UniProtKB/Swiss-Prot annotation:
It comes from Mus musculus (Mouse). This is Protein BTG2. The keyword Transmembrane helix does not apply. The lineage of its organism: Eukaryota, Metazoa, Chordata, Craniata, Vertebrata. Pfam families: BTG (PF07742). GO terms for biological process: anterior/posterior pattern specification; associative learning; cellular response to phorbol 13-acetate 12-myristate; central nervous system neuron development; dentate gyrus development; DNA damage response; negative regulation of apoptotic process; negative regulation of cell population proliferation. InterPro entries: Anti_prolifrtn, BTG, BTG-like_sf. Induction: By nerve growth factor and tumors promoters. Interacts with PRKCABP. Interacts with CNOT7 and CNOT8; indicative for an association with the CCR4-NOT complex. Interacts with PIN1, inducing mitochondrial depolarization. The modification Phosphoserine is found at residues 147, 149. The gene is Btg2.
Length: 158
């Protein structure tokens, strides 16, 4: 799919916000009203956080800065937004995976649950001039794999 030069980050942020909101929804305990407030606040927070770190012409540039990470320690952006809807740190840790990496890059949003989990793509759009030679944070992590990663749809049951 080709497209004109796009500088907005709305589709990517919407994919990331939708994914995180669905994790909270699936695990229960959060009302739809609170989820809507969470989603709007997270969209605003990520848009603000990424505004000087979004480079559609070089999608891998700034990838580490845009990465949302939970590694037994909650990502500060998620933590701040969750506190706005009254979710405490212990509640967040119960509702979200203890190991989650969410990459929000121009033209692609992907995630991995667990340190050795498969990387799954949530959103993908082909850039105008694809530069396949660049190593993104995600691609660097995949270099050591002996077999290709398998993409699975994650389902969480309560």
């Amino acid at each position: 799919m080709s497209h004109g030069k796009r500088t907005d980050m709305l589709p990517e942020i919407a994919a990331a916000v939708g994914f995180l909101s669905s994790l909270l929804r699936t695990r229960g305990c959060v009302s739809e009203q609170r989820l809507k407030v969470f989603s709007r606040a997270l969209q605003d927070a990520l848009t603000d956080h990424y505004k000087h770190h979004w480079f559609p012409e070089k999608p891998s540039k700034g990838s580490g800065y845009r990465c949302i990470r939970i590694n037994h320690k909650m990502d500060p952006i998620i933590s701040k937004v969750a506190s706005q809807i009254g979710l405490s740190q212990p509640q967040l840790h119960r509702l979200l995976p203890s190991e989650l990496t969410l990459w929000v890059d121009p033209y692609e949003v992907s995630y991995r649950i667990g340190e050795d989990g498969s990387i799954c793509v949530l959103y993908e759009e082909a850039p105008v001039a694809a530069s396949y030679g660049l190593l993104t944070c995600k691609n660097q992590m995949m270099l050591g794999r002996s077999s290709p990663s398998k993409n699975y749809v994650m389902a969480v049951s309560s």
